[in-house]
């Protein structure tokens, strides 16, 4: 149970970092 929770937490963190990085890159290219 703990491994599944930590896995989903890691997946959510990776997704958030990727999306934030992608948005930052898009804003940089937009300007």
Curated annotation (Swiss-Prot):
GO process annotations (BP): photosynthesis
Q: What is its main location?
A: plastid
- GO cellular component assignments: chloroplast thylakoid membrane; cytochrome b6f complex
The record ties this protein, via InterPro entries, to: Cyt_b6/f_cplx_su6
Q: Which domain of life is it from?
A: Eukaryota
Q: How does it sit in the membrane?
A: Single-pass membrane protein
- Tell me which UniProt keywords the record has, alphabetically: Chloroplast, Electron transport, Membrane, Photosynthesis, Plastid, Thylakoid, Transmembrane, Transmembrane helix, Transport
Q: Which family does it belong to?
A: Belongs to the PetL family.
Whom does it interact with, and what assembly results?
A: The 4 large subunits of the cytochrome b6-f complex are cytochrome b6, subunit IV (17 kDa polypeptide, PetD), cytochrome f and the Rieske protein, while the 4 small subunits are PetG, PetL, PetM and PetN. The complex functions as a dimer.
Function in brief: Component of the cytochrome b6-f complex, which mediates electron transfer between photosystem II (PSII) and photosystem I (PSI), cyclic electron flow around PSI, and state transitions. PetL is important for photoautotrophic growth as well as for electron transfer efficiency and stability of the cytochrome b6-f complex.
Protein's UniProt name: Cytochrome b6-f complex subunit 6
What organism, scientifically named, is this protein from? Solanum tuberosum
């Amino acid at each position: 149970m703990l491994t599944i929770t930590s896995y989903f937490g890691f997946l959510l963190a990776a997704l958030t970092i990727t999306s934030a990085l992608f948005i930052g890159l898009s804003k940089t290219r937009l300007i």
